Amino acid sequence: MTTVRSNDATQPSPQTEGLLDQLSAEFHATACVVVPWFLDNMPKMYFQDTSPEAQRVHLRSILAAKTSGRPIDVTLKSPDGHSITAIRSGNRAGVLADIVRDLPMDSSLRAAKIHSSKDGELVIDTFEFGEQEPYDKSNAAQNAAIETTIEFSRTHHPSLQADALRKFLIGSSARYLTTLTPLRMCRHFELFRQISGTDKPIVSLESEDDPTTSRITIAVSNARTRTMLERAARILMRHNASITRAHLDIVQDAPYGSVTFVGFIAQWADHTRIDAKDPRWAPLHSEIMRLKWLDFRVVELIGRRPEFTLPQGELISAFADLVRQMLVPTDALAFSRDRVTSTMESRAAITLPILELFTSRFDPTKPLADAEFNARSATLRTTIDAISDSDDAREIFSAFLRAVQAVLRTNFFVADRFSFSVRLDPALLVGPTRPELPFGVFFVYGRGFHGFHVRFKEIARGGLRVVKPANAVLFDRESERLFDEVYGLAFAQQLKNKDIPEGGAKAAIVLEPPAETNRCVKAFVDGILDLITPEPVTRSRIVDHLGREEFIFLGPDENITPMHIDWIVAHAAARKYPLANAFMSSKPNGGINHKEYGVTSEGVNVFLRIALLSQGIDPTKQRFTVKITGGPDGDVAGNMMRILHRDYGANACIVGVADGSGVGEDPQGLDHAELERLFVAGLAISHFNPKSLSAKGRVVKADTPEGVQLRNSLHNRLVCDAFIPGGGRPATINERNWREYLQPNGKPSSPLIVEGANLFLTPDARISLAKAGTLIIKDSSANKCGVMCSSFEIASSMLLNEEQFLKIKPTFVGQVLEKLREAARQEAIILLGEGRRHPSVPLPELSTKLSLAINASANAIQPAVASWAANNREIFREVVLNHMPRELSKTVGERIFAELPTAYLEWVVAKGVASRIVYREGIDFFASMEPSAVAETALRYLQKELEMRGLIQEVQGSKLQHAARIAALLERAGIRAALLEIET
């Protein structure tokens, strides 16, 4: 199109003048109607909250829409992107939630001002993003607001302390101080005092001057502001409450984070005030209290299925995840998360009675009797069996019913819970792929996560890990195998824990992106504590079908930080858990931090040294090459790099390291000093300084397809003497890809693997690689020292407070490290010795047989230990004191026997005796005995051991020519020979 320039730009054409006049008249006519209406109908707070310029911008947008005859649907964005204003026709139910839903997710919502016209024809919602402008002590207006508020509090809120109120106001923003009234700031402070440093929300309800409206204020710590505002608006909509005005404000709560205040001026849909005595308020209040901890799937579910209440929606979502874990081994595709959930949603006629069965059974006010529960279950079983249009639906509901029947405890009725948790009958999840029956299983479901805790003994311990998939596809994959991973890790831990009183356990939660780690860890732990704390108020809300007290001991694993550890211990104490100090190991101060002391790696190093010696390499005298997965910033891998240099110096040649960030490779060996720098700084291998490489070395980041391929294949590609998996996902080497570990000539790329990381190899892969000539030290042997260290820490935590522990910590830790190295040495020697005697049996199989032999023997010994304490006190005491680090025994004395739980002491003795005998006499020592004979033989063994010590001392003190030789033979074989004596 060609534009023709007018010869006289200052004189508009008659056509232009006519159009301008017409438009001006239309705008003027519209303005004459809209402006007075606007000034009369917008609430007073709108004009207080909104600058004159912003008011004019809003009016111009409204006029443009009105003049054109279109509905008002305008979104205004400030030039800097820090402010968005949504102007909409009509204050219909849910309009605020819909507007908030469409706000950008990548910006932090710092404030919101929601206003609707008095006649309900218009809403103007303004949202501010980015960091708040903090209080400025040089700003006179802000200082005046603080002083005015403090003066106001003296008259109207005399219970508020001026200094605390001032600190609160200083932690607010400039906008907060200059826009809120003294009354509102005082009311906020009253709420702030109640939740500061906590994770529980609080809700207040106040009357407004308008007799038809009320003010609902929600105060919540460390919440996502955008999410909180949207959820609150949706819950109000579900309960037929209309929002006429709303505000969102944030105040700092150092050192705990921040507190968000979401305030609504609202009324019921029938234009009546919301009153606390109104029966409609209690369910609304209850659901608001759940908002911070509620999964988004629940909010979406009740939005599309209004026939379900919020509590029912939560149960459907939770049981869908549990049912999926039950059915995944059958058909992972048919029983995906979405298909299980949609089946439950779409068949409410079956779902609702199952939910009613669950809630009735565990309602603490009137729990369903067992007979009635069984009768209803049978009726539902018949209904489910009659489903004829879908085999999958029948399977899903059958599993759903079995899951409900397997629940022994639940926190569903506990007030202020962070998550939904159940203690399950462990038989629920046992099957062909999970043959061993755990002792106990917990399932926890919450906002953005679900997780399990599995243990194989009454007293058990194991780490808590957080799995953080990067996207939805990876989340689905990790979620699908979650229980199998926890089950496998717990069973591996059971094998690993053969030297300590605790059995094997593991906990893991998988986060759905973009779920926040801290919140999910807190929700999971709180859900477990709900079910095990004896605190009376909590117990009164739990119907118990288990019938016994339970103790859980956790430790840190992937993505658990020192901050989490401190919070977990403090929260356990706040929840009145009796062994709070022992609830979590590796406490930064009152514990033994695994990474700081390298406890796991110390054991891995002992196994590596003895295995290298068995292959003709003395690492203290000869150069050897090693590749490692896991970065210098990791616990096991990083400490291995440090210890290899400490113990072997230049002999230890680390030719390759791979972690999540990339790879570092150098055939001359990666520079030890540079690796040490990365370890101390907590940096990944991608930060390795290329200047420290040889001419053939390289560092490649995993930010390209080539880098990812190099990272994922390093453990297969590099040819060296030993491979130490010190990090990486379970089943990295599996039955499908184990051949990639072999060289073209069929020989393994490293003839020795020492598994510092758990489950890096699958059982089938281990067997195949062993047959191909690889000597493999299995994870349950190689990295057992980490859990052993935690066990010693737990013992000290049950006997000492933090102050007492810190006084003995240096000596105590040194003695623990001695015990760890000795335990690793004993096992390495017997394993390799058994391997020489049974060359056709793969070493991983011997490792498992060793663990099973010790555990089975301990299981047979434990029931008899109670009588030992009474009738063989000297032996009982000797075994307990031999297990404990000397400094702990010296410090607490007889309190060891008075204060440690009886069951714990019995397992100290049972495991201590079993491991002592099997390490000395061999895997098959107890194999041919009846279980009833094991305890008797073990006791006689200990008695003969005491006798032999006396004989050895006697021989050593004699003047016999071969006294030393005789004493050595007695020590080596005297006990077993003495056992063959016939007692007379």
Regions found by a protein language model. Name each.
Residues 637-638:
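Short terminal or interdomain "cap/linker" segment that borders an active site or interface and mediates
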Residues 1-251, 266-294, 329-333, 343-353, ...:
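Regulatory modules associated with amino-acid/nitrogen control
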Residues 118-125, 129-131, 153-169, 200-222, ...:
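Ligand/cofactor-recognition surfaces for anionic moieties
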Residues 641-645:
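Short glycine-enriched nucleophile-adjacent loop
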